[in-house]
């Protein structure tokens, strides 16, 4: 990356950092049991809601108690359960049509990040009935108030219940794009560990590492604040203390609750301090090959951190100490390397299958466009430099 563009990126990031405290960020009201949705909707005088989820969650019966509880209290519950792992424009359009057809007055996002992103984007289309998603993508495009939205995460990973972002895939163009504005934050979030009990160990690992990615990228970037640093450190400690327990015993209520808390804290941290190239590259891989976001982040994280090199050693060492992986007496470089090695021990694949060399250039361009100049990464890279990350993560070459 040439000096002029580097200077532009850093200036853009500095201006955004200065402006951030004056922007209307808000935290959702938190509940700890899904049944608390009923008195909430009664208070809001909502008679009909659209519940956005996926077929796996619904077929497992996880949404059934809430559906029955809502209907038993004269609140109509319409279900959209076709959300894909990387929600598509078509998913959002279908969800919107169902909302309008049934005269719904509010939204419930019940699932992982995909269901929450689909519900957020649905709310944006309801707020802007004459626009399509392409007109609403990018930064600060969605200003109108969305319908009341309750986010119920069934994974402890994305933190989408507290973030300003929805990520949607254009299947035709094989491209993922983000919608970013403060109006996209759900009004309410239910952090109920019981709805995460059935999450299989493999997804517990990858979604938990997704949350760790949020904490790490928020912490190592150049737009941190005292609050986001504190939240990122807390989230990192919670994840390292609880992810193995949750992996081995999915019904351990305390471990599941702590993982939800970690994802929430990391979500706030990266909403205010942003992410980096791990996410940008992961989004492009998800758009091109439909690779689950948590898996892509998990595999990419140690590779990108090693690519950053010495520029992140100090901050990684601080994260390592916070996670009690080493002590303050450990040298900065050694502590940073210990942190990266601990990530590699999380039973995550080292490589991703199916990446084609002929796709790398276009994916790198997408990642470059997403990340630069917005993401305050510790070390700037252009599209050509980002291509190396795809080659490092690819199984087949």
Positions of the model-derived regions?
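C-terminal charged capping/lid subdomain of soluble metabolic enzymes
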Residues: 2-9, 323-397
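C-terminal catalytic subdomain
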Residues: 273-331, 340
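Fold-independent oxyanion-binding glycine-rich loops
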Residues: 33-34, 53-55, 83, 110-112, ...
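An N-terminal, well-structured beta->alpha segment
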Residues: 1-79, 388, 396-397
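N-terminal small/polar loop signature for handling phosphorylated ligands or for N-terminal nucleophile
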Residues: 58-130, 245-256
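Carboxylate- and glycine-rich phosphate/diphosphate-binding segment that chelates Mg2+/Mn2+
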Residues: 165-273, 384
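Glycine/threonine-rich beta-strand-loop-alpha-helix active-site module
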Residues: 90-193
